[in-house]
Design a protein with these regions (language model features):
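Short helix/strand-capping connector loops at secondary-structure junctions
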Residues: 161-174
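Conserved non-catalytic scaffold segment of RNase H-like nuclease domains
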Residues: 1-88, 98-101, 110-124
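Conserved small/polar residues in nucleotide/adenosyl-binding loops
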Residues: 178-180
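Acidic, Mg2+-coordinating catalytic module of metal-dependent nucleases/exonucleases
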Residues: 61-68, 73, 77, 109-164
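Conserved alpha/beta core surface patches that mediate binding of polyanionic ligands
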Residues: 95
């Protein structure tokens, strides 16, 4: 699943589907995600949605938690399906978190706790819930807070700050978050 952010705000343009893994669900996967063989048996196979997925992420910066792991699985499935591999710009939030908090746990749950992000709906690892949490973690990792603007102060310094912040908010940044 993926969610799209524009200017770090969710657009509600999401990509989500359940997939038939074409093999028996392992005990670990069942415990982690909660999806049974029976539930997944009638779902599409990855090769059937690969083109839609690639179209969705085309030209977008991808924010991924533990990108090496997710990309290895995604690219393996794309290779099997005979599709191009992902070559988007990637931002790995695990790398960002390790740089910011060396020696600390940087799991998604640990980062949610560190930033006081409510993850109580995350009983299982589900793609869209994880993407939503990751978007909030990512924004915190960037230290993106609301700009401090004083609209009553017309000093040249404050006017320049206003111009800078306005131009920042005019930028259109399209990001997708991927979670397998």
């Amino acid at each position: 699943g993926c969610i799209e952010l524009e200017n770090l705000v969710p657009t509600n343009n999401n990509f989500h589907c359940y997939l038939n893994p074409e093999r028996k669900v392992s005990e670990k996967a069942l415990e982690t995600h909660g999806y049974t063989d029976e539930f997944l048996s009638d779902k599409k196979k990855f090769k059937e949605i690969a083109d839609d997925f690639l179209l969705y992420i085309k030209g977008k910066k991808l924010i991924i938690h533990n990108a090496e792991f997710d990309l290895s699985h995604l690219n393996n499935e794309l290779k099997i399906a005979g599709k191009d591999l992902i070559n988007n710009e990637i931002i790995d939030t695990v790398v960002l978190a390790r740089d910011k908090f060396p020696g600390s746990s940087n799991s998604l749950d640990a980062l949610c706790k560190r930033y006081r992000i409510d993850n109580s709906k995350r009983e299982k690892h589900t793609a869209l819930i994880d993407c939503d949490l990751l978007s909030k973690v990512y924004i915190n990792l960037l230290d993106q807070k609301e700009p401090k603007l004083n609209f009553n102060n017309e000093t040249s310094e404050n006017i320049q700050m206003l111009k800078t912040n306005i131009s920042y908010f005019k930028k259109v940044i399209k990001l997708s978050l991927i979670h397998i």
